[in-house]
């Protein structure tokens, strides 16, 4: 079964420095139908204005992934990390026993567009960690493993049984992903247009897959997608 979550159906929020769309219930937006999907809890589609950002704030027991689509994001945290994340780069932070961080747009004029993702960990009280992985030079027509429980194939090790893939497609590109029994998929279209198992999707759309044996993607334009393969 495939259930489509259209971009325009998400929860919108707007502030002086931030325009965002919530795929799942978050902050003041609540929808009992969309409290998360398996261990996936948050997908926020954020556009932060020049000079804007999230001031220092704490987290505990959450796996936090940021994927930058355009612009740049300056990260600082209580573990001593200070980095500027650019398009095509994945940032990972395990909050574990507790971490504080800030995320700001260092440009005074150019917005930064990103996806902020939260995944529930499989255990509480893990050691806070930080990692990055770049797919800026990755060729289209393939899924790239960004994070996994085992850290296999050079992916970032995370505290949950989920494989997180970054996919890039051009017009006419086809990507296939085989699902093992009792696995689930959430697919989030970050940019562009594509077909998922014959169903049309556009930027901002999401899809929940259960009971499927494979994911078949066909690019209609230059596109990016995040695929979560969950237990």
Give names to the regions the model predicted:
Residues 1-231:
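Jelly-roll (double-stranded beta-helix
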């Amino acid at each position: 079964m495939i259930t489509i979550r259209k971009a325009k159906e998400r929860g919108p929020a707007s502030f002086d420095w931030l325009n965002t769309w919530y795929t799942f219930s978050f902050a003041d937006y609540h929808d009992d139908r969309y409290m998360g999907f398996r261990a996936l809890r948050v997908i926020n589609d954020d556009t932060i204005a020049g000079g804007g950002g999230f001031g220092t704030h704490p987290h505990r027991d959450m796996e936090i992934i940021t994927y930058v689509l355009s612009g740049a994001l300056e990260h600082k945290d209580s573990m001593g990390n200070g980095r500027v994340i650019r398009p095509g780069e994945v940032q990972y932070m395990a909050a574990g026993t507790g971490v504080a961080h800030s995320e700001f747009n260092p440009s005074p004029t150019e917005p930064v567009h990103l996806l902020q993702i939260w995944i529930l960990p499989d255990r509480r009280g893990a050691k806070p960690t930080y990692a990055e992985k770049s797919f800026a030079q990755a060729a289209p027509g393939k899924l790239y493993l960004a994070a996994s429980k085992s850290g296999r194939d050079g992916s970032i090790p995370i505290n949950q049984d989920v494989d997180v893939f970054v996919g890039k497609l051009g017009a006419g590109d086809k990507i296939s992903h085989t699902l093992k029994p009792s696995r689930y998929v959430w697919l989030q279209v970050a940019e562009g247009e594509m077909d998922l198992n014959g169903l049309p999707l556009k930027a901002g759309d999401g899809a929940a897959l259960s009971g499927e044996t494979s994911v078949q993607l066909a690019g209609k334009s230059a596109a990016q997608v995040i695929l979560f393969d969950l237990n």
